[in-house]
Structures are given as C-alpha cells and as structure tokens.
Amino acid sequence: MAGHSKWANIQHRKGRQDAKRGKIFTRLIKEITVAAKMGGADLGSNPRLRLAVDKAKAESMPKDNIENAIKRGAGLLDGVDYIECRYEGYGIGGAAVMVDCLTDNKTRTVADVRHAFSKFGGNMGTDGCVAFQFTHCGYLVFAPGTDEDALMEAALESGADDVVSNDDGSIEVITDPNSFSDIKDALEAKGFKAEMGEVTMRAQNETELSGDDAVRMQKLLDALEDLDDVQEVYTSAVLDA
C-alpha cells in the first residue's frame, strides 16, 4: 500500500491540465512532430508517435492538425526544428524535479527554467543530479472502487510489470513504456478504463509535503508547467491537500 493522498494529487493534476487546454494543442503538436522526426511516420512501428497521436485524439485535435504535424516531423512540410532538452533540480524539502522541454532556443529555455526554480524556492541542479531517482515507464491510474483482484489479473495477463494499491483505494498499473498503448487498449477491452494514463518518469521514492511546503511546491510546479517550452514536469513530491 502507498500514497494516502495519491488520488488527490492525480485529480489536482487533471484539473490543472484542463485549465490550460489552450496550451495543450501546442505541446501535442510539438510532441507529434518530434516523435515523427525521431522514429518515422508509421504509428505501428513508432510507439512514441502512437502515444502522442492518441493523446491528441483524446483532446479532440482536428485530424488535419495531427497529419500536418506528422508530415512536418517526417520532413514532408517545412516547420520549426525543435531540440529536446531536460533540466533537473530540487524543489521544496529537497523533492526531485525533472523538466522536459522542446525548444528552438535552448538559451532562452534554460534561462526561463532557472528563473522559475529560483523564484519559487527551488534550486536548478546539474545534469543527472536527480534522474537516477526516476524510472521510465507506462503508468495507468484507476479510480477507488475498481475491482482490485480482477484488474490485477487482467493487467498481469496483458503484460503489465506491476500493480500497486494505494491507501486511498486508487490502483496503479505500471508497464514497459513501449507496451503502454497495447496494455491500455487490452484493459479497456476488458472493461477497465483508466482515469489517467501516460508514459512518464515515475519517482522511485516519494517526498511527502504538507501545509505551507505543499503550497510552495505547487507554485513551483505550476510556474514550470506554464513555461511555453516545457512539455512535462516530473517530481518526487506528493502534496497533502
């Protein structure tokens, strides 16, 4: 059992994502473009692209936008050449933070990320300072009340790596990142629809924060997520609302 406030954190994050829907299309188009550039335009052989396209469809992105982003990545249309970069650091209470960016100007991006860390009580570190604390994996979260035994059986039969039950009743299914979409589809076919699912960097150990520390940490995370060049923010912090 783990994470008494995990479900509250998940719900807050979903609320944050809904509140910034205006930026979601921009970020997804960047991700689709880079995924197609790195792994080709075939969804069947490019798990990263398939995942990005699935996210775009879930957000009701128009088909033309998706297809044009793929074409730009594959070099069939002109477009901005984005660079992938990752910055690492520490938040309140020493909580680990990783920030993934796609940018056409690394000088601007690193300055913006460093400023956000400094302004909101964090500390930007060196490459590799916290990356070892995270595992690259697929991550599905199911609501409290889900039949744990049935979900566990279905998940393991589908090839999941692990199933974790939380104190609040929510259940997490952990997968290999390249198998995420297939396992998600297999579970949905068996009647299990996740409240949230993504390929992510999952903290191996959590840093629980409460009270003023939790408020300050949320401000730091919000500031980082609001930066135009930021795609994802990962943290070991679990905030007690």
Swiss-Prot record:
Keyword match NADP: no
Entry-linked Gene3D superfamilies: 1.10.10.200, 3.30.70.980
InterPro entries: Integrase-like_N (IPR017856), TACO1_YebC-like_2nd/3rd_dom (IPR048300), TACO1_YebC_N (IPR049083), Transcrip_reg_TACO1-like (IPR002876), Transcrip_reg_TACO1-like_dom3 (IPR026564), YebC-like (IPR029072)
Keyword Transcription annotated: yes
Cellular location(s): Cytoplasm
Chief localisation class: cytoplasm
GO terms for biological process, alphabetical: regulation of DNA-templated transcription
GO terms for cellular component: cytosol
Cross-referenced SUPFAM superfamilies: YebC-like
GO molecular function, one term: DNA binding
Keyword entries, A-Z: Cytoplasm, DNA-binding, Transcription, Transcription regulation
Protein family membership: Belongs to the TACO1 family.
HAMAP family: Transcrip_reg_TACO1
Name of the protein: Probable transcriptional regulatory protein LHK_02347
